[in-house]
Amino acid sequence: MHGDGFSFAAPGSWTVTRTGTTVAASHGGDTVSVTTFRLTKPYRAQLWKQAVTELDQVAAKLAAELKGTVVASRTVKVGSSTARQYDLAFTKDGEQLVERITFVLLGRREYELLCRYEAGKDEPACSQLLASFRPA
Protein backbone atom coordinates (compact mmCIF):
# COMPACT_ATOMS: atom_id res chain seq x y z
CA MET A 1 0.00 0.00 0.00
CA HIS A 2 1.18 3.50 -0.76
CA GLY A 3 0.41 6.78 0.95
CA ASP A 4 1.80 10.29 0.72
CA GLY A 5 5.48 9.67 1.43
CA PHE A 6 5.37 6.03 2.56
CA SER A 7 4.48 2.45 1.75
CA PHE A 8 3.70 -0.66 3.80
CA ALA A 9 2.24 -4.14 3.43
CA ALA A 10 -0.90 -5.56 5.02
CA PRO A 11 -2.73 -8.86 4.57
CA GLY A 12 -4.12 -8.96 1.02
CA SER A 13 -7.67 -9.86 2.03
CA TRP A 14 -8.07 -6.81 4.29
CA THR A 15 -10.22 -3.80 3.31
CA VAL A 16 -8.18 -0.69 2.47
CA THR A 17 -9.33 2.88 3.18
CA ARG A 18 -7.62 6.19 2.48
CA THR A 19 -8.56 9.44 4.20
CA GLY A 20 -6.44 12.58 4.12
CA THR A 21 -2.99 11.61 5.37
CA THR A 22 -3.97 8.08 6.51
CA VAL A 23 -3.93 4.73 4.76
CA ALA A 24 -5.56 1.90 6.73
CA ALA A 25 -6.30 -1.78 6.22
CA SER A 26 -8.79 -3.65 8.38
CA HIS A 27 -10.40 -7.02 8.86
CA GLY A 28 -12.96 -7.61 11.59
CA GLY A 29 -11.74 -5.66 14.61
CA ASP A 30 -8.09 -5.70 13.53
CA THR A 31 -6.59 -2.62 11.89
CA VAL A 32 -3.21 -1.41 10.67
CA SER A 33 -2.66 2.14 9.48
CA VAL A 34 -0.07 4.78 8.77
CA THR A 35 -0.78 8.48 9.28
CA THR A 36 1.65 11.29 8.50
CA PHE A 37 2.04 14.61 10.28
CA ARG A 38 4.25 17.56 9.41
CA LEU A 39 6.58 18.63 12.23
CA THR A 40 7.04 22.35 12.86
CA LYS A 41 10.81 21.86 13.19
CA PRO A 42 12.97 19.17 11.61
CA TYR A 43 13.69 16.20 13.86
CA ARG A 44 17.37 15.39 14.51
CA ALA A 45 18.77 12.38 16.39
CA GLN A 46 20.19 14.75 19.05
CA LEU A 47 16.59 15.53 20.05
CA TRP A 48 15.74 11.89 20.88
CA LYS A 49 15.51 12.32 24.68
CA GLN A 50 13.18 15.30 24.36
CA ALA A 51 11.15 13.48 21.70
CA VAL A 52 10.70 10.46 23.99
CA THR A 53 9.44 12.69 26.81
CA GLU A 54 6.94 14.37 24.47
CA LEU A 55 5.82 11.08 22.90
CA ASP A 56 5.33 9.53 26.36
CA GLN A 57 2.91 12.37 27.10
CA VAL A 58 1.14 11.92 23.75
CA ALA A 59 0.71 8.18 24.41
CA ALA A 60 -0.72 8.85 27.88
CA LYS A 61 -3.19 11.34 26.38
CA LEU A 62 -4.25 8.89 23.65
CA ALA A 63 -4.76 6.14 26.25
CA ALA A 64 -6.89 8.50 28.36
CA GLU A 65 -9.02 9.35 25.29
CA LEU A 66 -9.63 5.61 24.85
CA LYS A 67 -10.38 5.27 28.58
CA GLY A 68 -7.44 2.87 28.71
CA THR A 69 -3.86 2.69 29.92
CA VAL A 70 -0.35 2.59 28.49
CA VAL A 71 0.75 -0.97 29.30
CA ALA A 72 4.14 -0.92 27.54
CA SER A 73 6.57 1.55 26.03
CA ARG A 74 9.80 0.78 24.25
CA THR A 75 12.35 2.07 21.76
CA VAL A 76 12.45 -0.02 18.57
CA LYS A 77 14.06 0.02 15.14
CA VAL A 78 11.87 0.54 12.09
CA GLY A 79 14.14 0.04 9.11
CA SER A 80 17.20 2.10 9.94
CA SER A 81 15.27 4.56 12.12
CA THR A 82 15.00 4.59 15.89
CA ALA A 83 11.31 4.78 16.82
CA ARG A 84 9.16 4.89 19.95
CA GLN A 85 6.40 2.32 20.45
CA TYR A 86 3.50 2.10 22.91
CA ASP A 87 0.88 -0.52 23.70
CA LEU A 88 -2.42 0.97 24.86
CA ALA A 89 -4.97 -1.38 26.45
CA PHE A 90 -8.65 -0.46 26.42
CA THR A 91 -12.16 -1.87 26.15
CA LYS A 92 -14.50 -1.12 23.25
CA ASP A 93 -17.97 -2.62 22.94
CA GLY A 94 -17.06 -5.13 25.65
CA GLU A 95 -13.95 -6.33 23.82
CA GLN A 96 -10.44 -6.05 25.32
CA LEU A 97 -8.19 -4.44 22.69
CA VAL A 98 -4.58 -3.39 22.30
CA GLU A 99 -3.56 -0.45 20.15
CA ARG A 100 0.15 -0.54 19.33
CA ILE A 101 1.38 2.84 18.13
CA THR A 102 4.87 3.36 16.75
CA PHE A 103 6.14 6.89 16.12
CA VAL A 104 8.83 7.28 13.45
CA LEU A 105 10.39 10.76 13.19
CA LEU A 106 12.27 11.68 10.01
CA GLY A 107 13.16 15.26 9.16
CA ARG A 108 9.92 17.26 9.09
CA ARG A 109 7.71 14.15 9.06
CA GLU A 110 6.15 12.13 11.83
CA TYR A 111 4.81 8.74 10.79
CA GLU A 112 2.31 7.16 13.16
CA LEU A 113 2.12 3.41 12.58
CA LEU A 114 -0.92 1.95 14.31
CA CYS A 115 -1.97 -1.64 14.83
CA ARG A 116 -5.15 -2.57 16.72
CA TYR A 117 -5.92 -6.15 17.72
CA GLU A 118 -7.82 -8.19 20.29
CA ALA A 119 -5.88 -8.56 23.56
CA GLY A 120 -4.40 -12.02 24.05
CA LYS A 121 -4.52 -12.85 20.35
CA ASP A 122 -1.68 -13.13 17.87
CA GLU A 123 -0.78 -9.92 16.04
CA PRO A 124 1.14 -10.88 12.87
CA ALA A 125 -0.19 -7.84 11.00
CA CYS A 126 1.66 -5.59 13.49
CA SER A 127 4.95 -7.31 12.72
CA GLN A 128 4.23 -7.11 9.00
CA LEU A 129 3.48 -3.38 9.26
CA LEU A 130 6.78 -2.62 11.01
CA ALA A 131 8.86 -4.90 8.79
CA SER A 132 7.40 -3.54 5.54
CA PHE A 133 7.08 0.19 6.34
CA ARG A 134 9.19 2.38 4.06
CA PRO A 135 9.27 6.17 4.04
CA ALA A 136 9.57 7.70 0.57
Please annotate each region the language model reported.
Residues 1-19:
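N-terminal "mature-domain start" segment
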Residues 4-6, 88, 101, 131:
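Short non-domain terminal segments
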Residues 6-8, 78, 113, 129-130:
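Generic hydrophobic secondary-structure signal
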Residues 10, 62-66, 129:
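Short, structurally constrained coil/turn elements
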Residues 14, 113-136:
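Surface-exposed amphipathic alpha-helical segments
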Residues 19-112, 116-124:
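Conserved polar/disulfide-associated segments of primarily extracytoplasmic proteins
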